[in-house]
């Protein structure tokens, strides 16, 4: 799986490097931004369909019905965040405004969410998983390729002049909303999507500490992302 991840990273790094060497400023061409957003939307949808098909197959083999298996999918931060990317990119692709259909800080938030999701998955959840075939393709798609492509798209086409340090705190709203819903759902369904939210196994105190740690991690990552946005905006504003 490490080799496959390296291939994906190399495939994304090449176009990013090319952009950095040629033009650091985001493209102002709405048609190109809309076209690439549409392609990203289609790819994200394909990755979601494949990953959902695989996940539903696993749960149904364990005896769960189709409806319950589909419902369980909605409990994963990965599925929900990838869905946000697909919907947002679809809206950009179909709007005459292009990226301007969203505020600049909202596009930064979407990029922050999906890239942080990929990082958390890689650090906390990917270890010990021996995937192959379509399972590996689906896993790489939603956890690595979509985050990388979204980062590239944001880098190339989104303006970054509205991104402020205060947004790092505001951006905590989505992960906190998800965590609250996941804990509430787990209380009634006796199922938690991630081990670090499993109250039944680790108790409320430990899960509270886990949530605080993750929240702090999200906030620090948010600050780092704001610094990146400001740095890119400064480079784009420099006369050439």
Question: Model segments located where?
Answer:
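N-terminal membrane topogenic signal
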Residues: 24-40
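Membrane-interface transmembrane-helix boundary segments in multi-pass integral membrane proteins
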Residues: 32, 75, 189-224
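Alpha-helical transmembrane segments of multi-pass membrane proteins
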Residues: 42-59
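Juxtamembrane "helix-exit" motif on the non-cytosolic side of transmembrane helices
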Residues: 55-60, 122-131
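Non-cytosolic membrane-interface motifs at loop->transmembrane helix junctions
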Residues: 64-72, 103-105, 129-142, 165-168, ...
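Membrane-interface loop-to-helix entry segments
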Residues: 77-80, 135-148, 208-212
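Membrane-interface helix-boundary motifs at transmembrane edges
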Residues: 95-106, 159-166
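Alpha-helical transmembrane segments in multipass membrane proteins, preferentially the mid-helix core
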Residues: 147-163
């Amino acid at each position: 799986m490490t080799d496959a991840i390296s291939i994906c990273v190399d495939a994304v790094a090449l176009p990013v490097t090319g952009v950095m060497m040629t033009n650091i400023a985001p493209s102002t061409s709405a048609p190109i931004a809309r076209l690439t957003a549409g392609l990203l939307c289609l790819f994200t949808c394909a990755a979601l369909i494949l990953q959902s098909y695989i996940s539903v197959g696993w749960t149904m083999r364990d005896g769960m019905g189709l409806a319950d298996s589909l419902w369980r999918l909605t409990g994963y931060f990965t599925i929900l965040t990838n869905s946000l990317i697909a919907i947002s990119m679809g809206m950009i692709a179909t709007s005459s405004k292009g990226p301007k259909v969203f505020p600049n800080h909202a596009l930064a938030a979407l990029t922050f969410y999906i890239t942080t999701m990929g990082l958390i998955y890689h650090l906390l959840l990917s270890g010990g998983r021996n995937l192959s075939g379509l399972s590996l393709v689906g896993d790489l798609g939603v956890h690595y390729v979509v985050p990388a492509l979204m980062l590239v798209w944001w880098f190339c086409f989104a303006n970054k002049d509205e991104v402020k340090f205060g947004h790092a705190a505001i951006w905590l709203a989505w992960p906190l909303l998800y965590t609250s819903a996941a804990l509430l759902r787990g209380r009634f369904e006796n199922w938690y999507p991630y081990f670090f939210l499993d109250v039944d196994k680790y108790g409320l105190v430990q899960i509270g500490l886990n949530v605080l740690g993750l929240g702090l991690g999200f906030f620090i990552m948010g600050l780092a992302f704001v610094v990146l946005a400001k740095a890119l905006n400064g480079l784009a504003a420099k006369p050439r």
